[in-house]
Amino acid sequence: MKFRIGELADKCGVNKETIRYYERLGLIPEPERTEKGYRMYSQQTVDRLHFIKRMQELGFTLNEIDKLLGVVDRDEAKCRDMYDFTILKIEDIQRKIEDLKRIERMLMDLKERCPENKDIYECPIIETLMKK
């Protein structure tokens, strides 16, 4: 079955411009065209767009998705390649979690030192943030 760009957009929950953008980036292949120039997309493109959206939901950037699709598209790709890619993403997420925990601790500390009845120019939160 083939889909025009509007049908593909509706089916995948994206807009037409997103599809064109992904084409320019090479995330999805350039589609066949009708004699009148309409783009006609395959079910394979539908599956690929669903994959891209799911990866974005999991926190992958378009650059990371492009690299991942490069692994998927290689004929000689092995499951180990996906495993290695996943390990790198897990390590990246763990670093981000540690950074967020550090920021949370700092903000909790600032919140505890904030007397609510002081004027803004005496606020320890602002004083601390301006010093660093």
Swiss-Prot record:
**Annotated DNA-binding ranges?**
5-24
What is an annotated GO biological process for this record, any one? response to mercury ion
What's this chain's function? Mediates the mercuric-dependent induction of mercury resistance operon. In the absence of mercury MerR represses transcription by binding tightly to the mer operator region; when mercury is present the dimeric complex binds a single ion and becomes a potent transcriptional activator, while remaining bound to the mer site.
Task: Please identify the protein, giving its name as recorded.
Answer: Mercuric resistance operon regulatory protein
Q: Which CDD domains match?
A: HTH_MerR1 (cd04783)
**What GO molecular functions are on record for this protein?**
DNA binding; DNA-binding transcription factor activity; mercury ion binding
- Please name the source species: Bacillus cereus
Cite the SUPFAM superfamilies for this sequence: Putative DNA-binding domain
